Amino acid sequence: VCSSDLNNPAELAKIYSSIDSIREDDNYRIARIKIVGYSSPEGNYDANARLSEQRAKALVQNLKHAYKLDDSMIECRSVPENWEGLAAWLREYCPSYMQKVLDIIGQTPEPDARDAKIKAIDGGKIYNALLREVYPKLRLVEYTVSYTVVPFSVEQGREIIKTRPDKMNHNEMYQVAVSYGKGSDEYNRIIDRKS
């Protein structure tokens, strides 16, 4: 799972790089890509719902174009206002106003009313600080790439264990070791490696 600001070419390059690292490895197959777009909580809820959906769909279109992905491989959704992200930031950094804002988030179910109550704290100073320092970080797209490991034969395993043993689990290593015969030098070397 990674987060990204799609307006930043460096972040988009990171997304491509993570997908490329899976696509270029013959041992993996991409099964699904999940995209979630978020907007920060300021402003009108309906407008934020549109923005978060647009963020998510923009990345979907970008990936579909770059990788010729089928619709069935992509799950796309959006979160209109990233209140969970704001609460997580508050808990992590513990500013003096943390509890006031957390109470508003927890006790005010209507998003636009939450926003108005936060604006009212300390004459808007806290809201303006959040707007400047925190809210930009809450406008993002998260993506998760799910993949499967392609099964390989014992012969392929013998090659993989020499060059990329980190790609093998203990059972696969054991199968390769047994293929050399219990007690053989190769068997012992592999068994010692996996311990």
Task: Give the predicted meaning of each segment.
Residues 143-144, 166:
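Extended repeat-based scaffolds of very large eukaryotic assembly and lipid-transport proteins
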Residues 2-3, 195:
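Short, small-residue-biased leader/transition segments that mark boundaries at the very start
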Residues 18-21, 128, 157-160:
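A short, compositionally biased domain-edge/stem linker segment
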Residues 36, 144-146:
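Residue-level recognition of well-ordered beta-strand positions that form the cores
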Residues 147-160:
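Short, charged low-complexity linker/loop segments at the C-terminal edge of domains
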Residues 40-143:
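Periplasmic OmpA-like peptidoglycan-binding domain that tethers envelope proteins to the cell wall
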Residues 4-36, 64, 172-176, 181-189:
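Periplasmic peptidoglycan-binding/anchoring modules of Gram-negative envelope and division proteins
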Residues 137-138, 155-156, 166-178, 188, ...:
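Alpha-helical tetratricopeptide repeat
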